[in-house]
Regions:
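Hydrophobic, membrane-embedded alpha-helices of multi-pass small-molecule transporters
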Residues: 3-21, 30-42, 68-71, 99-106, ...
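Hydrophobic alpha-helical segments and their helix-loop junctions in multi-pass secondary transporters
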Residues: 3-6, 73-84, 127-152, 201, ...
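Membrane helical hairpin/interfacial module
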Residues: 17-100, 104-105, 304
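Extracellular/periplasmic helix-loop-helix junctions in multi-pass membrane proteins
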Residues: 25, 262-268, 280-299
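Membrane-water interface regions at transmembrane-helix termini and the short interhelical loops
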Residues: 46, 85-88, 103-125, 176-180, ...
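Small-residue-rich segments of transmembrane alpha-helices in multi-pass membrane proteins
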Residues: 61-68, 72, 125-140, 188-198, ...
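Membrane-interface loop-to-helix entry segments
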Residues: 78, 82-85, 97-98, 110-140, ...
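Membrane-interface interhelical connector segments
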Residues: 204-232
Length: 323
């Protein structure tokens, strides 16, 4: 069972991937509104669960178990997507699958160690990430152009921000200590994403901010006491560490769903097959990888939404019986 501090640290560390890797290219308005929507959705889900694990609450009945199985597959696909995004930490070698395969291998190994071990790792990483990103945001303010901070983007950008900031909500599938709020961490991540998007657009211009790994470009021109500092190596490391936490969180959620379906531990053959399939998947050409993970993620997202429907339906039935 995850303690409150470790769960909060794991949620925020995992949320750094969409907050600083994806949302800066979507505009600060889209990041803020999408993040607020994601936090609201997770808050409503937490209220429906009443402290229970989403995996335990949903895996009841044939329909719920079928949706849980599809959700587990979708979470595995999202973990592969998160590992694949690790390539963007090194734009010059973005075509190499080595970083993605390494992050997936480490995440798979960490997920086998349990949520407590991953939570301890996130509790150590979170202060380092907060200081690093905070320094870049603060010292980039002197380069902002107010004319570039006008709201830009489309409703689609807000939807993308909402979907990406929902990923740390995978912590709802884990067993957590009472009083742990995943939506609170998501709300903080939404504010960080909006700040990163505003700094990126105000420094690079809105067209420049639309490029991939735009925040990494901002880190290359940070000036401290009149001297240009090169933070891109540190940012690349931070992106890898947060990608590791997100990938591990998604794998832990998938494992929790499978354990709720089959209380007995999965065999070594199943784990080895999943590990081998993931590595082969990540070594595919990049367009095919993202296309396949996209389809899997969409199926998993639909199944997760259906799980929420099952949970809310079971809750209403119990309320009627108690009445």
């Amino acid at each position: 069972m995850l303690k409150r501090r470790k769960s909060f640290a794991l949620t925020l560390t995992a949320a750094a991937v969409p907050a600083f890797g994806l949302c800066p290219s979507l505009g600060w308005a889209g990041a803020l509104l999408g993040g607020a929507a994601a936090a609201w959705i997770l808050n409503r889900t937490e209220r429906a669960l009443r402290g229970r694990s989403l995996a335990k609450a949903a895996a009841c009945g044939a329909v719920g178990r079928a949706a849980a199985a599809v959700s587990a597959l979708g979470l595995f696909g999202l973990a592969l997507w998160a590992a694949g995004r690790s390539r963007l930490a090194f734009p010059e070698t973005a075509g190499s699958p080595l970083a993605a395969a390494l992050i997936f291998a480490l995440s798979f190994w960490a997920a086998r160690s349990g949520a407590e071990a991953v939570g301890r790792c996130a509790a150590v990483l979170l202060p380092l990430l907060a200081v690093l990103y905070g320094v870049i945001l603060v010292f980039s303010l002197s380069q902002l152009r107010l004319s570039w901070l006008l709201p830009t983007g489309t409703p689609r950008a807000g939807l993308r921000a909402c979907a990406s900031l929902l990923l740390p909500g995978a912590a709802l599938f884990l067993r957590r200590e009472d009083g742990v709020s995943v939506s609170r961490g998501t709300a903080i991540a939404a504010l960080a994403a909006a700040a990163a998007a505003a700094v990126t657009a105000g420094t690079l211009s809105p067209p420049g901010a639309a490029a991939r790994a735009a925040f990494l470009t901002v880190s290359r021109s940070v000036s401290i006491l009149g001297v240009i500092q090169r933070f891109e190596a540190l940012i690349s490391g931070a992106m890898l560490m947060s990608g590791f936490c997100l990938c591990t969180l998604l794998l832990l959620a998938a494992r929790e769903l499978l354990d709720s379906l089959a209380p007995k531990k999965s065999s070594a053959a199943v784990k080895t097959s999943a590990f081998a399939a993931g590595l082969i998947f990540l070594w595919l050409p990049t367009p095919e990888t993202f296309r396949l993970t996209g389809v899997t993620a969409i199926c998993g997202g639909v199944a997760c939404a259906f799980l929420l429907f099952v949970v809310s339906k079971n809750k209403s039935q119990k309320n009627e019986e108690n009445a």
